[in-house]
Amino acid sequence: MGLSQLWLWLKRLVIFLQVALEVATGKVLMTLFPERVKQNILAMGQKTGMTRNPRFAPDNWVPTFFSIQYFWFVLKVRWQRLEDRAEYGGLAPNCTVVRLSGQKCNVWDFIQGSRPLVLNFGSCTUPSFLLKFDQFKRLVDDFASTADFLIIYIEEAHATDGWAFKNNVDIRQHRSLQDRLRAAHLLLARSPQCPVVVDTMQNQSSQLYAALPERLYVIQEGRICYKGKPGPWNYNPEEVRAVLEKLCIPPGHMPQF
């Protein structure tokens, strides 16, 4: 084992202990002060839109916090961020992804000249991803002539056999590429109006872009010019709109100097 690999495992150990302490503390506080903890979780939910999501009542998701499933999911997300290779201003990782036909391709295959490419990572079991899906579709409509868009379907955020919410979309964790492709096909019912591909079963793009549970990026000429903060708390398609308004010149308009 090399020094860099040893250092990675040490960082993973530290994160494991941090998450374990956070979850244990949260569990104790939820037992002693259930109403206060519930109000704190609901306050966080306001930022993601969960409290405005008509599909979910608080009892569908608040009690799942600090469970063992919560622990493993949060740990996976924190560990994944150690693999982040998508730096603002740097070259975008040219990961392998899979079209819904089953054909392999790369992220860079969707870059067209100097047109910005928006990457939208998420899954059907991620409530904020679906809640804000119409916002994303409006971006596609408004900038279709000057930018390109790609949805990369990654592992489920709240799979039925993982950190599950009641009344959520019923999808189990992907055991095979076919499972992931079937899950991504469900997204087509929402008319995404842009290409949809899936991450590999090695979760390469999700890891290198630190995209779990959802995230937005903008790439131009192979470089990252916008790196959205991790979801669900900071997943914001309207930030992408502001970026595209600066990068894209509407047809028939000339820049003013």
From Swiss-Prot:
Record topological domains on the Extracellular side: 1-12
Bilayer topology: Single-pass type III membrane protein
Effect on the protein upon substituting H185N: No effect on enzyme activity
Pfam families recorded: T4_deiodinase (PF00837)
Residue numbers annotated as active site: U126
Tissue-specificity statement: Highly expressed in the liver, kidney and thyroid gland.
Swiss-Prot/TrEMBL catalytic activity: 3,3',5-triiodo-L-thyronine + iodide + A + H(+) = L-thyroxine + AH2; 3,3',5'-triiodo-L-thyronine + iodide + A + H(+) = L-thyroxine + AH2; 3,3'-diiodo-L-thyronine + iodide + A + H(+) = 3,3',5'-triiodo-L-thyronine + AH2; 3,3'-diiodo-L-thyronine + iodide + A + H(+) = 3,3',5-triiodo-L-thyronine + AH2
Residue numbers on the Cytoplasmic membrane side: 34-257
Alphabetized GO MF terms: selenium binding; thyroxine 5'-deiodinase activity; thyroxine 5-deiodinase activity
TM helices/strands, residue ranges: 13-33
Keywords of the record: Cell membrane, Endoplasmic reticulum, Membrane, Oxidoreductase, Selenocysteine, Thyroid hormones biosynthesis, Transmembrane, Transmembrane helix
Cysteine pairings via disulfide bonds: none
Cellular component per GO, a single term: basolateral plasma membrane
Compartments, as annotated in UniProt: Cell membrane; Endoplasmic reticulum membrane; Basolateral cell membrane
GO biological process: amino acid metabolic process; generation of precursor metabolites and energy; hormone biosynthetic process; thyroid hormone catabolic process; thyroid hormone metabolic process
Enzyme Commission designation: 1.21.99.3, 1.21.99.4
Enzyme class: oxidoreductase
Primary subcellular site in the record, as a coarse category: membrane
Effect noted on mutating H158 to F/Q/N: Loss of enzyme activity
Function recorded in the entry: Plays a crucial role in the metabolism of thyroid hormones (TH) and has specific roles in TH activation and inactivation by deiodination. Catalyzes the deiodination of L-thyroxine (T4) to 3,5,3'-triiodothyronine (T3) and 3',5'-diiodothyronine (3',5'-T2) to 3'-monoiodothyronine (3'-T1) via outer-ring deiodination (ORD). Catalyzes the deiodination of T4 to 3,3',5'-triiodothyronine (rT3), 3,5-diiodothyronine (3,5-T2) to 3-monoiodothyronine(3-T1) and 3,3'-diiodothyronine (3,3'-T2) to 3-T1 via inner-ring deiodination (IRD). Catalyzes the deiodination of rT3 to 3,3'-T2 via ORD.
PANTHER family membership: IODOTHYRONINE DEIODINASE, TYPE I IODOTHYRONINE DEIODINASE
Sequence similarity: Belongs to the iodothyronine deiodinase family.
Subunit structure: Predominantly monomer. Can form homodimers but homodimerization is not essential for enzyme activity.
Name of this chain's protein: Type I iodothyronine deiodinase
Organism: Rattus norvegicus
Record lineage: Eukaryota, Metazoa, Chordata, Craniata, Vertebrata
